[in-house]
From Swiss-Prot:
The gene is metXA. It comes from Haemophilus influenzae (strain ATCC 51907 / DSM 11121 / KW20 / Rd). Substrate binds at R212, D338. Residues 41-343 form the AB hydrolase-1 domain. Its main location: cytoplasm. Changing L306R: Can no longer use acetyl-CoA as acyl donor, but can use succinyl-CoA. This is Homoserine O-acetyltransferase.
């Protein structure tokens, strides 16, 4: 099944939270399962930073949630009707910096406006309106997707029954913002970046590859890397190149990333992570969080090096103090932050129960 596309905000532009407007927004989306007659089994999936509209494939390819989704699995396509879309600012079909600006006939590049999570959620809401979905059984997201799910619960508190937030906090930490800054600088200082207007020339591949390598280290754990590589070396490794196997692994991940992601989208979405503030548009964070009516599942991985346990615990406190019906779980995983994508055994029950409201 191929990705579906729809153009939204073609008559009335989207007013962005930080100023500016966007019109004629293409949204790439995918659906799985069947919407029942009562229309009460719809679930919205919000993807993480570099995800897309296709968490699952039925033709042998690997989606980013391939092992979690399907008939009888945690994301049960026999039970639920899933909707997943690429986020605003992305590069997998939905309008972003690499898209053609209808006013100029050229890619937006440096002219793409600054976006925040609230803008992403507005586009998702417009998609559901287009699809005729007026209520959701649940919204689920991990990492950056968890921030989207959280904002949905604030901005549209009557729209869903359940929220499932995996490995994501209410605020991004100073350390995590620091990681993102280093990654952005790697891209911006690539000689080919050209202020973001590189589409008619050579893209900033070296900078983006380096940024991805650093990002990978924040998604993994020392224990996992030690088990996989230890201090093993490559027989053909150069002294100043990929001498250790872990270096070769990171180089491979950096190069592989270039095949599927745009540098400008990476910069914009990293900044949206940094900037996430659920109180934007409200007087304070407690006023914002107190709007939440959905049953809320929050899952923390104690070995997560990006959204650390202390950040999830602070989020737990804020949600509880705001009167949210919170169900909090934490456990270790060798996979660290990426556990929500790969550690099915640990997450299966929490996802099943969270979607069902059990």
């Amino acid at each position: 099944m191929s990705v579906q596309n729809v153009v939204l905000f073609d008559t009335q532009p989207l007013t962005l939270m930080l100023g500016g407007k966007l019109s004629h927004i293409n949204v790439a989306y995918q659906t799985y399962g069947t919407l029942n007659a009562e229309k009460n089994n719809a679930v919205l999936i919000c993807h993480a930073l570099t995800g897309d509209a296709e968490p699952y494939f039925d033709d042998g390819r690997d989606g980013w949630w391939q092992n979690f989704m399907g008939a009888g699995l945690a994301l049960d396509t026999d039970r639920y009707f899933f909707i997943s879309s690429n986020v605003l600012g992305g590069c997998k079909g939905t309008t972003g910096p690499s898209s053609i600006n209808p006013q100029t006939g050229k890619p937006y590049g440096s002219q793409f406006p600054n976006i925040v999570v609230q803008d992403i959620v507005k586009v998702q809401k417009a998609l559901l309106d287009h699809l005729g979905i007026s209520h959701l059984k649940a919204i689920i997201g991990g990492s950056f997707g968890g921030m989207q799910a959280n904002q949905w619960a604030i901005d549209y508190p009557d729209f869903m029954d359940n929220i499932v937030n995996l490995c994501s906090s209410i605020y991004f930490s100073a350390e995590a913002i620091g990681f993102n800054h280093v990654m952005r600088q790697a891209v911006i200082n690539d000689p080919n970046f050209n202020g973001g207007d590189y589409y008619e020339g050579t893209p900033p591949d070296q900078g983006l590859s380096i940024a991805r390598m650093l990002g990978m280290l924040t998604y993994r754990t020392d224990l996992q890397l030690a088990k996989a590589f230890g201090r093993a070396t490559k027989s053909d490794g150069s002294f100043w190149g990929d001498y250790f196997q872990v270096e070769s692994y990171l180089s491979y991940q950096g190069k592989k990333f270039l095949e599927r992601f745009d540098a400008n989208s990476y910069l914009h979405l990293l900044r949206a992570l940094d900037m996430y503030d659920p109180s934007l548009g409200y007087d304070n964070v407690k006023e914002a969080l107190s709007r939440i009516k959905a049953r809320y599942t929050l899952v923390s991985v104690t070995t997560d090096q990006l959204f650390k346990p202390i950040d999830l615990y602070k989020s737990k406190q804020l949600l509880e103090q705001s009167g949210v019906d919170l169900h909090f779980y934490e456990f270790p995983s060798d996979y660290g932050h990426d556990a929500f994508l790969v550690d099915y055994d640990q997450f299966e029950k929490r996802i099943r129960d969270g979607l069902a409201g059990n």
